[in-house]
Every structure is written in structure tokens, then in C-alpha cells.
Amino acid sequence: LHLLKVDGGDRIYDVVCGAPNVRENMKIAFVKAGGRVPAGEITKATVAGYESEGMCCSAFELGLSDDKAGLMEIDVDAPNGTNLKDIYPIDDIIFEVDNKSLTNRPDLWGHYGIAREFAALTDRELKPLPLSDLAYDGDNKIKVTVGRPDLVYRYSCVKMDNISKNTSPLSMQIRLYYCGMRGINLLADLTNYIMLEMGQPTHAFDANKIDEIVVDTPKEDCKFITLDNTERDITTDTLLIQNGSTPVAIAGIMGGLDSEIVGDTNAVVLECANFDGVSVRKSSSRLGLRTDASARYEKMLDPEMTVTAAKRFAYLLQDIDKGARVASLLTDEYVRKYPEIEITFDKAYVDKYTGIDISEERIVKTLTALGFEVAKDGASFNVKVPSFRATKDVTIKADIIEEITRIYGYDNFSIITTKSPLKPVKSSPVRSQSNEIKDILVKHYNLHEVHSYIWCDVRKYKKLGIEVEDNVKVLNIESS
């Protein structure tokens, strides 16, 4: 135990503390007697014969982390006695969103995509993310070979070195913890942060263990130890990231133990890639290994995000660690592109399918806020679908109608009685008798009703002008 003198800003407090990492002049989180933590109220107590007037807290005791190892050390310059809420993002706002709104929207698997939706709903401007320009004066460039272009859309990577810091800022650790992730180290935390922020998975390899990158499937089945220290059976249809011929990661799923970022890592090769979603899903299922990265790749991510993610990583790293440098040119193998999608419609189409009058100005404003490019051509709207919605999401005019109406608000639709006359259908005595007979046979005589393939007369179809040559035919047409 330690008997501490703690400067609480208003006076000096006597505190008994057993934390192993306490030291003189350490700036910590302190709760005075009478204050509260998630576990309850802090009271004065006598410990080993000494009065303790408060509590020096770990991040776990404050509900900000699962780290119980020692006191939470404040990493910003703030006066003693400052409320932690004034310097860290402790107060959190939780929005409850129906999962069906997210499942098939890969752009909403990151906070920036959600922010775009809120900006459109509230008529606010979406702020751009600060990015690095990846400026580099040399000619060093990481060699990348894509051996399976059918399984890769884009592979971007860049090297960064002169990294001296190992721990991410507390503000970042708190945000990660609130999103269900624990802080590991600066580089790992940055990759997780960008994945949560942008929805784009990234992976940092120890640069000292990477010479050249080969993205390919193995020539024969092999063993591979992943970051969780588990040996995996890799088949010949599993896409791997290799250092030459040595596997260093399972593409889109998990990195390898041998290229893991460790405490003294001072240079990294950052991977920002886009892999085929079906391939990732099959490999993930076969290995019994589903990760945050694989869950996103399965949704068919936007290949345009890879370079942006690399620039974002470099910006955040250099903002935290001022000495960190871009140490190579950007390698960008853009193997396959999704086709650009343009959709043309007019206001009459919107009016017909919504039943309400949404102004042309509102249509343009809504689509623009959601990232669509809109050009007016007479009575028509020519809309270019943004890349982050063009991966099997928005493809037809009806999809555009959905975008307009959901932002307009379904609750704002007027309730209008239909003008179509509704007439009750007369019951059929034959159908009623048939159903009654079926009930008797099933309920009283324990028979089973079987619905088999229906016999049909091709000649009747031909008389009706129905083409039957290309129809699917049952080989064994015996009915029971």
C-alpha cells in the first residue's frame, strides 16, 4: 500500500492506494469522498490505520476500459481538479437503429456513413475527414503482386517509419471501448479506429518482416498460425497475403502471429485492401473464424475507400506521433472496378410511386446530401450513384425513390383513402366443400395431403401464346 498526497485542485488529500504503477507527479483520475463511480459512492475510510479521503482510479473503475492493471494516467495537460468529462469523450450518446437498416448497407458499417445519414436527415453539412497527402520524396515503393485477380478488387499499401509512441491517446481508447474494443497498442488501435470510423478494415504489418507482398492462394494445403495463436488449416482456395512465398495473413480475416506488431515496432506496412466478399465469407466459414474485418468484407465494400483509409491512418498517426514519417510511395493495385451506375428518372415518376408532391428542389437536395451526383436535363434527373452505394445496392429507379422517401419521412406522407372500389369476393361452394373434405380426411382418418408437381398440358400453353421451350422441366414427372 502507498500513502499518497493528492492535489485535487482545491486542496491536498490523503489517500491510501495499492496500485503498482503509482509514482510521484503522476497525473491521475481521482474521485473525492462523496463522489460516485459505477460501483457506487466513494466514502472516507481508514485503511491500515490511515484515513483515505478519496479514490485514485483505474480506467476499469471508471467504466472506461477493462484494464485493471493500474491507475489511469491522464495524458493531456489540464489543471488539477478538472472534471474528466471536460477533457475526454466520456458522456456518450447512443442512437438505436433498426438492424435491418444496416445489414445490407456496407456504407453504414462505419460511423462516417451514419454521420452522412444524420447530415441528410437534419439538413446539416457533413464535415470531411482530415487526411494526409502521403507526401514522400524518395522512390521506395512496396512491390505487390496479385496472383488471384478474381478474388481482389484493390490492394493499396504504404510504409511508415520513425514511430516512437506505443500507446494510443486515452480519448481514442475510450471511444474504442465504448464500441466494444479494447485498447492494444497505438498501431493496432489506429487500424481498429479507422475500421469503426470509415467501415474499411486495415492491417498493419511489422515492416521489418515484409519484403514484398504477394496476394494469392497457396499451391497446396498448409498450416498457418493466426494472431490469436491458433494453428489453422489453410486450403488451396483460401486467399492469403504472403511475404514472398511465406503467409503473413488470411486475406480479409486475420493477420499472422509472425508479422504481428509488437512493443518495439517502429515501422509498419499498412494494408488497405478490398477483397471479394464471397471469397472472404467462404474462407471465414470454412475456418470457423469470423472477425470484424470479415463481417465488413462480406458486405461488398467500396474499393474507392482503400486509399482514403491509408491517408486517414497516416494523418492520425502523425497527429499523435509527430515524428512518424511516410517512408514509401503509395502502392495501389486497382485490379477490378465496379461499373459506374447512372439512373435517369423524372418528377412524374416520383409523384406516381409516392402519391405525394415532393418538390424538385427537395429531390436534388436529398440525393446530393446522400452523396449522389444529380444533373437536371429538362424534365429529367440524371443521377450518378456514389461508389459506396454502387456495390450491389442502388441499381434501379425504385432504389432512388426509396432514398428520397425515407429522408422525406414516411410519417410525413398524407393518409388518403384509396379510390379503388373494394368488393367482397363471393365464396365458392365447391372450394368450401373441398376444404371440408380435406379436413375430414386429415383430422379424422390420419391421412396426409401431398402437394406435388402439377400436371400441365403444353398444348394449352401454346394456345395461350406462352413460350414453353425454355421452361424448366422435371425429369421424373411421376406424381404421387
Residue spans for each PLM region:
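Terminal amphipathic helices with adjacent charged low-complexity linkers/tails
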Residues: 120-147, 321-350, 357, 400
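Extended, well-folded interaction surfaces typified by the phenylalanyl-tRNA synthetase beta subunit core
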Residues: 343-347, 351-480
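Flexible, glycine/charged-enriched surface loops at secondary-structure junctions
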Residues: 123-134, 183-188, 317-331, 375-378, ...
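Glycine/proline-enriched, intrinsically flexible loops and inter-domain linkers
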Residues: 2-4, 127-222
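Conserved phosphate/anionic-ligand binding catalytic regions in large, soluble enzymes, centered on
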Residues: 20-27, 103-123, 180-205, 245-267, ...
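Phosphate-backbone binding interfaces of nucleic-acid-interacting proteins
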Residues: 1-135, 269, 286-288, 292, ...
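Conserved catalytic alpha/beta cores of large enzymes that bind or transform nucleotide phosphates
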Residues: 60-61, 165, 232-340
